[in-house]
Regions:
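Charged, amphipathic alpha-helical regulatory modules used
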Residues: 42-130
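Cys/His-rich microdomains that often coordinate metals
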Residues: 7-11, 38
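Acidic surface patches and DE-rich sequence motifs
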Residues: 19, 31, 54
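Short metal-binding segments enriched for Cys and/or His
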Residues: 30-48
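Short metal-coordination and nucleic-acid-contact micro-motifs, chiefly zinc-binding Cys/His arrays
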Residues: 1-2, 7, 25-27
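Alpha-helical scaffold elements adjacent to nucleotide-binding pockets in ATP/GTP-utilizing enzyme cores
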Residues: 27-30, 70
Length: 130
């Protein structure tokens, strides 16, 4: 990986921890030349690991951007949440789905998104379900 402050520099991992509850890895990295230290959080991309089973036997890939937009559209009542919380909520949904052992379907994505939104903002959950 390259350094965030010096893109021409390579880095090395000096410390690493896996989460026990989520599919995420925390890594402390250090630039080899400058010694600058920074932290990264690595998580699997659902689009590369689980195909979405569509009706009729076709498959599609998970699209985080599409999910972010559909979540943002649920926050008509809260523009701040639409702008700043949609990404984090979509990533929460993606983590939940990546830990789920079942087949990934549009209905499963919608249900997981609805439950996540309801926990965060009940009105947004209702708007999403509508």
């Amino acid at each position: 990986m390259i350094s965030l402050n010096s893109p021409h520099e390579a880095t090395k991992v000096i410390n690493s921890r896996s989460s026990k509850k989520r599919p995420i890895v925390w890594r402390r990295r250090q630039s080899i030349e400058s010694g600058h230290t920074f932290t990264t959080y690595e998580r699997p991309a659902l689009a590369e690991n689980k195909p979405i089973a569509l009706v009729g036997g076709n498959t599609d890939i998970f699209n985080l951007g599409r999910l972010i937009l559909s979540i943002a559209a649920s926050f008509h009542h809260n523009e701040q949440a639409a702008k700043y919380d949609s990404l984090w909520l979509a990533q929460t949904v993606e983590e939940e789905l990546s830990m789920d052992q079942g087949t990934l379907t549009p209905a499963r994505i919608a249900t997981t998104t609805y439950k996540t939104l309801r926990r965060f903002d009940e009105l947004a959950g209702i708007q999403y379900a509508a």
